[in-house]
Each structure stands twice: as C-alpha cells, then as structure tokens.
Amino acid sequence: MNNSRIKNIVNLSAAERYGYFIRKVSDFEEVWGLKDKEGWALMGNNEQVLFPVWSEKEFAELCKWDNYQPYSIPLDDFIEKLLPKLEKDNVMLAVFPLSKGKGIIRTVQEIIADIERECEQYE
C-alpha cells in the first residue's frame, strides 16, 4: 500500500475507519493485532480493557508499541477462537486506533454482527 493511500485512510473519521475495517477484514479474511512473546497487546483504562485491531499490517505498524509486532489473525480464528475468549474476559475491541485516539470501541457481538453482515455480500 502506498503512503498516499495510508495517509488518506488515516485521515478518515473513526466511524469511516470502522467501516473500512469491516469491509477489508471481510474481504481479505484477516485481522491484525499486536503481539509480543508474552501475548497480545491490550489498552484501556481502569474502566475497560480494549483489544486493538486493524485491517492491514501497515496500520498496525503505525501504532506499534515497543517490543510488540503486528501479527496476522485469520478471520475464522478471530471469530471462533479469539473473540469468545475476549467476550468471556469482558474485553471490548478498539477498532483501528491511531496514535491520536482509541478508534471505535465495539463489543464482541457488535463486531461479529457487522462482519457477518458484510460477509453475506461476498456469498
């Protein structure tokens, strides 16, 4: 992806980036998170723990934390394995966060419903 495309997407509103995320992960069947040798990166405050996700490696790299690397998650594993664990642990998702903000915060069920709705268009 070229720098001008990255810049255009980064400059979208959080809601527009969320729509972009849903379309891309549904189409490419891949989600990106940040991981180190001890596990997934989490963010948030005392009130809510958030699991940050991006649609493409380039965007995860923009928000890369020390010692964390972008890590690809196949969409099936994301929906069938990771999301149920996050839901059980009361973790919500920060979709497409940037250095200037947390992105759109969604529950596991909201993410699943939006991805399923988008995937129906590809069938």
Feature map (PLM): residue ranges:
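Conserved NAD+-utilizing ADP-ribose enzyme module
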Residues: 1-123
